[in-house]
């Protein structure tokens, strides 16, 4: 495993995660409006900012895990497409164990659930595509 490229791929994944996340909320203000319909479920924005460092660390760890999985699945290196393929699997996993799980356990509506499912699925496809773009195996000399 190429640890320097793994670190760079993780960084690329983090950048992709946040760029997409900010762009998504800018392009889909209706999604933010949906979140605001559930003030008893979600923290107000000011309160979220107080715990945001923990969330950012968790996101970083999750993306590092995705990069390690990518490196183990593609030891000879890969492409954006192979990264997007892994992202599709991770995106489906996230939708099933996070988004649908929240729909069942939290008092939120189907509209917010659909927004989250589409947004988070695409986010992981993009993150892993960025990982696939950057990660390359170590150069070996015969």
PLM segments and residue spans:
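Juxtamembrane/disordered regions of integral membrane proteins
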Residues: 1-142
């Amino acid at each position: 495993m190429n640890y320097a490229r793994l670190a760079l791929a993780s960084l690329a994944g983090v950048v992709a995660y946040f760029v997409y996340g900010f762009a998504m909320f800018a392009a889909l203000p209706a999604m933010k409006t949906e979140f605001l319909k559930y003030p008893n479920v979600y923290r107000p924005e000011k309160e979220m900012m107080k715990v945001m460092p923990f969330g950012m660390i968790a996101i970083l760890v999750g993306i590092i895990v995705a990069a390690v999985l990518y490196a183990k699945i593609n030891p000879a290196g890969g492409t954006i497409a192979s990264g997007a393929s892994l992202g599709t699997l991770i995106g489906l996993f996230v939708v099933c164990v996070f988004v649908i799980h929240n729909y069942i356990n939290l008092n939120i509506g189907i509209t917010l659930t659909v927004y989250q499912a589409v947004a988070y699925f695409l986010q992981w496809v993009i993150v892993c595509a960025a990982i696939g773009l950057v990660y390359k195996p170590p150069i070996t000399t015969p």
